[in-house]
Amino acid sequence: MIITSLLDTDLYKFTMMQVVLHQFPGAQVEYRFKCRNPGVQLAPYVAEIRGEIRSLCSLQFQDAELDYLRSMRFIKSDFVDFLGLFRLNEKYISVAPRPGGEIDICIRGPWLHTILFEIPVLAIVNEVYFRNTQKVPDFPEGRRRLDAKIALLQAEGLEELKIADYGTRRRFSRAWHEEVLRVLVARLGTGDQCAEAPAGPGQFAGTSNVLYAMKLGVTPLGTMAHEYLQACQALGPRLRDSQVFGFEIWAREYRGDLGIALSDVYGMSAFLRDFDLYFCKLFDGARQDSGDPFAWGERLLAHYRKLRVDPQSKTLIFSDALTVTRTIELYRQFRGRCQLAFGIGTHLTNDLGSPPAHEPLQVVIKMTRCNGQPVAKLADSPGKGMCDDEKYLAYLRQVFDIPAQA
């Protein structure tokens, strides 16, 4: 059994789910799966994937897990009570082979009852694929690479650089994920505990994975994902105001907690048009998840300065396909100018070699419809969108004044 706890997912699933319970309990949604690697054959493993999903749907939250969620100040008691009754239902998810060897995964049902599928299902697809295609995983190489990354992070002048694990969805396996996290905690240190230096804070800020945050005593991290702002396209008063609507509902729910705004659902230009002085003061910062991170950071800092908001009081979070090398480059460019956070995913949890011997799966599950209408993101990177309704995409670009990609 790959997934053994419903906490084995990202924190932002719970923070979004709480908003859904309180603000949008009747919303109906649809999600679709996509593997971006050309030629990857997942169809032979459909029965195995279905079996793992069946096991996932048998899980319930344990009392200790509910107590852990309840200990977070932004999680409300009625939401924890709801989770105490919660189970994922197999009737809302289908897995089917496609002629070319690919697979279709469709999740359709009430948003409140389907939101927790995405992360564990992606982790299942990954682990099933790799345990069938790599019978003898190159763990020695994975450990060597992890050692090299830690050495880079512990170089002189980087003592204040902190990284976080965002790698649940694309991990090689659950066991490897846990090993990586235990090594990072021991070698980099957490919070005020510096592991391998005489003094100073640790360099491991925490993990997006709630189960391992609980098990290892580190900070669980996350706020919102694209699906939240995409759903607001269908749930808000009018399309042009949907991003503002999403941020306002979020602020109403969390009253200053979880103040990181996601910036790339409509691209950075549209984000900055909506992210006015009110939101700049209300939110703690923003997260970059597509496009050029260096240009993004400079634009956001300039935006803060223009509105006379002190950038030093704001946090820039980088989380788009980060490597340790790229993280260090970003840290050197922005340190001292603002608060910084870095979420590293696949590069931490699925780096056991180089292609063709080992290549991580670029798998995603994205919301494509809400309340019967298409929803989409117009990210700052081509190829990151999932919407197949060209008319809706054209309309979205027009409404948010975004030029079509060449």
Swiss-Prot record:
It comes from the Bacteria. Pathway: Cofactor biosynthesis; NAD(+) biosynthesis; nicotinate D-ribonucleotide from nicotinate: step 1/1. The keyword Phosphoprotein applies. One of its GO terms (molecular function) is nicotinate phosphoribosyltransferase activity. One of its GO terms (cellular component) is cytosol. It catalyses: nicotinate + 5-phospho-alpha-D-ribose 1-diphosphate + ATP + H2O = nicotinate beta-D-ribonucleotide + ADP + phosphate + diphosphate. The modification Phosphohistidine is found at H226. Transiently phosphorylated on a His residue during the reaction cycle. Phosphorylation strongly increases the affinity for substrates and increases the rate of nicotinate D-ribonucleotide production. Dephosphorylation regenerates the low-affinity form of the enzyme, leading to product release. The keyword Ligase applies. Belongs to the NAPRTase family. This is Nicotinate phosphoribosyltransferase. The gene is pncB.
